[in-house]
């Protein structure tokens, strides 16, 4: 009988499918549900509150069975975590096409989604949960690290040493925050309502210590700050209660952000509700729970604004908490900016974003070899060298060994081709799955996050992620996905992802060159179209064709 059981991706070179493209999809699906990787694997939940890899266990079993028999000229179709068909295509076509959580506009809200989910008709795919390229907390770590580095450069003379950051949320995404802060030499107080989340981050070496109380957390933080010693501190509690208290007591906080699961009100614990009662209350009275959660978020955001008024650097880290607080009636919810317009958009203009790869061999040595190859490929890229060195020393692998680093247009293709050559030569023990987060330069429409405050006002234009997905299908990606609602919740985002398998063949090399050129190229084009000078310069320098800038009237 199909049901919950431990899942772990196979390692080594023995195939259980008919080719490495299919084998890679199979292993990455299984890896998403590895207990080392997934937050709640028995429920098929990978990260992000309720982000799932498969709709139900019967669907999971059907996908595994189908991938093992899928031919080199066939494509499996996945509709919100359930395999619904196999079509004959061709060897350049993706082996899997995925559409998760997509709803027509007027129906794109949590209430309707949950009604359909209860009927067994859909699932929430988040971003990399339902697209089978989640690699654990490392997947967001460099982006979080770069964000805090940008904060340091903007306000603290290039370092967070001697500063205290206050944040909440230590789940699969938020769990990157403590290590990202300490990598920038700062001190972090990280609040979470779930004791298991705190222990998991300590176990995975993302979080240093757990405080016994708020007073203990502040004592540890001030001592470390005064010594200019990096330290991350986990604190059990509800941010909607603790932040207002800390503000009222004048806590010495320099930076404030948040990564609770505010994108889904049923995943945010209301003030006055015990954590152990949360799931039952949310299931019994979702409307009442949502109202109370939003009221609590309003208190949380009001305190964040209070810290900003007191001089702290405050930003939204893309979980929709400002929008939820506004729905609860808090008028100053958008007084502080999102992290993309504040710090990250110049990188997007260059086609930069979270490039990642996983070693299907299961051998950490394969990642070490790819790290070395990257440093040789890009000897002038100081930030890349700094990141790879720190990641090699401090990042704990979850599931299949993997690495993430931010690379731009003209870099990702070089890295992918080099990796494919390493597989072909036998330098690597098995192929690599090369993908990215959906949070990328040209693959998202999300007015509360990636496309907030676009120069031309095109925040909500959703053509771009659809074009991105189609370009990746046309370019030869191994699997391609289009999702709705990731990161910020239902009705607030459309986004696309791709994974390409470096199996050492000449065909894989051709596909990789096209995909890893065109995928980040969409980011350059999207930002040229929005009027960003940096993107125009990148397009001119690197030969990205933009028809509206060609011809006599360009």
From Swiss-Prot:
The keyword NAD applies. PROSITE patterns: UROCANASE (PS01233). Pathway: Amino-acid degradation; L-histidine degradation into L-glutamate; N-formimidoyl-L-glutamate from L-histidine: step 2/3. The active site is at residue 405. It comes from the Bacteria. NAD(+) binds at residues 48-49, 126, 172-174, 192, 238-239, 259-263, 268-269, 317, 487. GO terms for cellular component: cytoplasm. Pfam families: Urocanase (PF01175), Urocanase_C (PF17392), Urocanase_N (PF17391). It is an enzyme of class 4 (lyase). InterPro entries: Urocanase, Urocanase-like, Urocanase_C, Urocanase_central_sf, Urocanase_CS, Urocanase_N, Urocanase_Rossmann-like, Urocanase_sf. The keyword NAD applies. Its main location: cytoplasm. Keywords: Cytoplasm, Histidine metabolism, Lyase, NAD. GO terms for biological process: L-histidine catabolic process to glutamate and formamide; L-histidine catabolic process to glutamate and formate. Binds 1 NAD(+) per subunit. It catalyses: 4-imidazolone-5-propanoate = trans-urocanate + H2O. It is found in: Cytoplasm. Its cofactor is NAD(+). Its EC number is 4.2.1.49. One of its GO terms (molecular function) is urocanate hydratase activity. HAMAP family: HutU. Catalyzes the conversion of urocanate to 4-imidazolone-5-propionate. Belongs to the urocanase family. NCBIfam families: hutU, PRK05414.1. This is Urocanate hydratase. The gene is hutU.
């Amino acid at each position: 009988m199909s049901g919950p059981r431990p899942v772990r991706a196979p390692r080594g070179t023995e195939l259980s499918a008919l080719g490495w493209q299919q084998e890679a999809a199979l292993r990455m699906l299984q890896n998403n549900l590895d207990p080392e990787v997934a937050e709640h694997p028995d429920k098929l939940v990978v990260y992000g509150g309720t982000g799932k890899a498969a709709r139900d266990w019967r669907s999971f079993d059907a996908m595994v069975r189908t991938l093992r028999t899928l031919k080199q000229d066939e494509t499996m179709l996945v509709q919100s975590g359930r395999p619904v068909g196999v079509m004959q295509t061709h060897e350049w076509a993706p082996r899997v096409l995925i559409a998760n959580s997509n709803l027509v506009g007027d129906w794109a809200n949590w209430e309707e989604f949950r009604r359909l989910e209860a009927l067994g008709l859909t699932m929430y795919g988040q971003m990399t949960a339902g697209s089978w390229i989640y690699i654990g907390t490392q997947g967001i770590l460099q982006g979080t690290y770069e964000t805090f580095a940008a904060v340091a450069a903007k306000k603290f003379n290039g370092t967070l040493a001697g500063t205290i950051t206050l944040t909440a949320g230590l789940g699969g995404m938020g769990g990157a925050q403590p290590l990202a802060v300490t990598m920038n030499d700062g001190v972090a107080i990280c609040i979470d309502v779930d004791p298991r989340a705190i222990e998991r981050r300590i176990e995975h070496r993302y979080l240093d210590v757990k405080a016994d109380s708020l007073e203990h957390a502040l004592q540890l933080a001030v001592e470390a700050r005064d010594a200019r010693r990096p330290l991350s501190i986990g604190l059990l509690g509800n941010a909607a209660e603790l932040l207002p208290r800390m503000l009222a007591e004048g806590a010495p906080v320099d930076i404030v952000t948040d990564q609770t699961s505010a994108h889904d009100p049923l995943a945010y614990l209301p003030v006055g509700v015990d954590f152990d009662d949360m799931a039952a209350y949310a299931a019994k009275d979702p409307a009442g729970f949502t109202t109370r959660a939003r009221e609590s978020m309003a208190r949380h955001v009001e305190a964040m604004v209070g810290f900003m008024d007191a001089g702290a650097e405050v930003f939204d880290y893309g979980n929709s908490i400002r929008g939820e607080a506004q729905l609860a009636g808090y008028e100053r919810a958008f007084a502080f900016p999102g992290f993309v317009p504040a710090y990250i958009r110049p990188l997007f203009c260059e086609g930069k974003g979270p490039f990642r790869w996983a070693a299907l061999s299961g051998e950490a040595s394969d990642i070490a070899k790819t790290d070395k190859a990257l440093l040789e490929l890009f000897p002038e890229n100081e930030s890349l060298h700094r990141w790879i060195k720190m990641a090699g020393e401090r990042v704990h692998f979850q599931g299949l060994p993997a690495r993430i680093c931010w690379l731009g247009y003209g870099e990702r293709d070089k890295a992918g081709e080099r990796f494919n050559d390493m597989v072909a030569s036998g330098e690597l023990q098995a192929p690599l799955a090369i993908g990215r987060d959906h949070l990328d330069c040209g693959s998202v429409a999300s007015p509360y996050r990636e496309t907030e405050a676009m120069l031309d006002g095109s925040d909500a234009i959703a053509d771009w992620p659809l074009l991105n997905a189609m370009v990746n299908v046309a370019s030869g990606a191994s699997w391609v996905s289009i999702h709705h609602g990731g990161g910020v919740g239902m009705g607030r985002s459309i986004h696309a992802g791709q994974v390409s398998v470096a199996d050492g063949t000449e065909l894989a090399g051709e596909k990789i060159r096209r995909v890893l050129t065109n995928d980040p190229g969409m980011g350059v084009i999207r930002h040229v179209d929005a009027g960003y000078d940096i993107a125009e310069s990148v397009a001119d320098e690197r030969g990205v064709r933009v028809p509206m800038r060609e011809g006599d009237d360009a």
